[in-house]
Each structure stands twice: as C-alpha cells, then as structure tokens.
Regions:
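Generic recognition of flexible, low-complexity loop/linker segments
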Residues: 17-19, 158-160, 232-234, 255-258
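Intrinsic-disorder/low-complexity, polar/charged segments enriched in Ser/Thr/Lys/Arg/Asp/Glu/Gln
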Residues: 30, 168-170, 233, 243, ...
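Active-site donor-binding loop signature of nucleotide-sugar glycosyltransferases
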Residues: 33, 190, 272-274
C-alpha cells in the first residue's frame, strides 16, 4: 500500500496499556531511550564486535555479497540475557528495562527464557549480491519487497512452507548508531491479523498434531499479497538504548541500504525471538501461537 514511512509512536513514556494497544493494532511499538537498556547495550557491544570479526563466524554467516551477517542464535547469552566476561570483554547483566518488562508483565510472558539472540548486521550496499542458492526472482524480492516474511515458517525438501517454530515475540535491540536509511527493519502494519486469519482458516478442522505437517504455502502467499496491497509499510530504526517489538505473526523484512544512509560502517541489531512453552510432548504450541494476543 505504501512505499514506506518512518514509524512514529503515539504513546507517552511507554505506558504499558498504550504500548499494548499499539502492538495489537499495528503489530509494532518502538520504546524510547532507556538507561537500563543502554547499560546492557554498552556491555554487549564488545561481544558483538568480536563475533562480527571472527573469521569462522563470518564464513558461516556472511551473506549477500558480504553485506549481511545473519548470525542466527549466535550470541552466547543465558536465558536471562546475561553473558559472562570473556577475555577482555565485560560481563553483560541480565536483560532489563521497559521493553522486556512490558513483554513479561503486560503481555504475560513472565519468566519465559530468552533464546540465544540473533546478531543481524547489515553493511553498506546491502543487498549487494544474491546468495549462492538464491534465484533471480528471490533476489528481486529481497531488493523490492525487503525479503518480507513471517518468522517461524520453514521450507521442506520440496520448498513448501510449513509451521516450524512458535515464537512468542520479536524484540529488536540496536547496538550501534545507524541512520534511518541504513537497511532499516520494515513491517506491514496490521499484517499480523491477516496472517492469523489465513493460517487459522487453513488449519481449522485438522488435528493439532497434524498442523506442522501441513503445506501452508498457498495460504501464506495469498495473505502476504493481501498485506502488501492493504497494509501500510513502515520503517523502524532506533538508537542504542531504544528498542522495538514486532508481533510474532507480522510480515516484516529489511530494506536495502540506501546510498544516502551516511558513513556508518555497520547496522547491528540483536534480536530475541524466544519460543512459546512447548506442549507436553515437546512439540511447538501452534495453537497458542495463533490464539494469543
């Protein structure tokens, strides 16, 4: 619907009820500066730099012609977000602040353990080139549609999409200054409800234990097309000490790094995407994934 507009909050001092309404309506919220979170970021920066400079990590995770370090679950944090001191890198305290407190207290995630965080880094020129296994059409989608996706979907051997992981939320924490045109996070407002309806319609009437085996490709691509046509695309950027959350069902991606973005050398973001508590048999709780606010 829109080619992209910078995001603006309407809440005052991140009031929990204002944040909740925004998250459930728009599918995102950006928190203002938080000194407690800023302290966590300051401690984690040396760890992020060490990971980004590690040759083995770069070999494993550098993508798109050297302009994207994917870094999935690469930060060795404990379930509370803390890290021990490693060499000359300081210990990182447990993750605290308004954003994680909102998710725990207002959204009901309580003591849900955090996953090992993703360290996603974009560099000038992203995306410079396709990945080795990326088709021309897929690369065009990356450039023109921000590689927009819903987290938790997986592809099987036939490249069909299935439910794979039941995330609770997406919490994004920038760890360095970067301009708003330096490969910002993008999200289609309200797309989470389009996706919820699409997946619910596709899976209604099927036993819960069969949900993860269903091909949801057609439902997903149709819902994605609807979101592109009817939802406002907004760009989200934030400074260290700020954070933003995205609804787990939202359609989101990363915009290209614009030539006007300025001289910044990197755009690193730490993402926490913990999974909802599993069912007694250890499988993901996709019913909760679809039903929770």
């Amino acid at each position: 619907m829109s080619t992209g507009q910078p995001a603006h909050n309407t809440g005052v001092a991140d009031d929990p009820e204002v944040v909740r309404r925004a998250l459930l309506t728009r599918g995102w919220y950006r928190f203002g500066y938080d000194s407690t979170l800023a302290d966590w970021v300051s401690a984690v920066i040396p760890h992020a730099r060490a990971i980004a400079d590690d040759p083995a990590a770069r070999h494993a995770w550098l993508r798109c012609g050297g302009t994207w370090f994917a870094g999935v679950n690469i930060l060795p944090n404990a379930p509370d977000g803390s890290l021990p001191a490693i060499g000359d890198r300081p210990a990182v305290p447990p993750l605290q602040g308004r954003a994680i407190r909102f998710l725990r207290e207002t959204m009901g995630h309580g003591a849900l353990p955090l996953d090992r965080a993703q360290l996603s880094i974009c560099y000038p020129g992203y995306p410079a080139a396709p990945q080795p296994d990326e088709s021309e059409a897929a690369f065009r989608y990356r450039r023109n549609r921000d590689a927009a996706h819903v987290d938790g979907l997986e592809r099987d051997a036939a490249r069909n999409r299935r439910l794979g992981e039941a995330h609770a939320f997406i919490l994004a924490i920038p760890v360095a200054e970067a301009g708003p045109e330096a490969a910002p996070f993008t999200i289609w407002e309200g797309s989470h409800e389009i996706m919820r309806t699409a997946f619910r319609t596709r899976l209604t009437g099927l036993p819960r234990e069969a949900w993860s085996q269903q091909d949801v490709t057609a439902a997903y691509t149709t819902a994605r097309r609807e979101a592109f046509e009817s939802c406002r695309r907004v760009t989200l950027s934030a400074a260290p000490g700020e954070a933003y959350i995205a609804h787990r069902l939202s359609l989101h991606g990363v915009a290209p790094w614009e030539a006007t973005a300025g001289p910044g050398a990197w755009r690193p973001i730490v993402y926490f995407r913990p999974e909802l508590p599993a069912l007694p048999d250890g499988t993901p709780d996709f019913e909760a994934w679809l039903s929770l606010p």
